[in-house]
């Protein structure tokens, strides 16, 4: 049995490409209770907490947990609370390079645990006020770290990426695939 510690439609879609048969169960953790560390350490601690919270309910299962955050100039950009916050984020990212971090935590059915943080650099085009307003009108910023989804209207903001495209979507598939292999890495 494989458990994905998330109800994210994007993560489910990406995991189906690797593992066609799994169950999705969100982890119930208090993210605010965890100390905010540097971005890579923070996403790893969140993924670990999510995964570990499901171990008692699924002791013999393979559990996959992930957490993705956007960081710009050392500051974490989570999901915007409203349109105004999304506008601030997108405006700040215009013409700049930022990082997308995903912490992965995998507990295999044999009990071994694997962890990894994947980083992707994303560069946005310079954005005019009209560009930002046009993007915000799509409402594609909702429920997205950094106020954009590269698989949606946010793709029009992106000039280039360096690293794993699927990491920006929330689940670095090729890295996860290798973590799921039975052999040590």
From Swiss-Prot:
**Cellular component per GO?**
cytoplasm
Q: Which cofactor does it need?
A: a divalent metal cation
Please give the Gene Ontology molecular function terms for this protein: dTTP diphosphatase activity; UTP diphosphatase activity
Q: What is its main location?
A: cytoplasm
Q: What sort of enzyme, by top EC class, is this?
A: hydrolase
- What is one process in the GO biological process aspect for this record? nucleotide metabolic process
Q: What is its EC number?
A: 3.6.1.9
Reaction(s) catalyzed by this protein?
dTTP + H2O = dTMP + diphosphate + H(+); UTP + H2O = UMP + diphosphate + H(+)
Residue numbers marked as site, Important for substrate specificity:
10, 68, 151
Q: List all disulphide bridges recorded for this chain.
A: none
Active site feature = 67 (proton acceptor)
Compartment(s) = Cytoplasm
Keywords in alphabetical order, please. Answer: Cytoplasm, Hydrolase, Nucleotide metabolism
List the InterPro entries hit by this protein, alphabetically: ITPase-like_fam (IPR029001), Maf-like (IPR003697)
Job of this protein: Nucleoside triphosphate pyrophosphatase that hydrolyzes dTTP and UTP. May have a dual role in cell division arrest and in preventing the incorporation of modified nucleotides into cellular nucleic acids.
Extract the HAMAP family matched here: Maf (MF_00528)
Query: Which family is annotated?
Result: Belongs to the Maf family. YhdE subfamily.
Report what the protein is called: dTTP/UTP pyrophosphatase
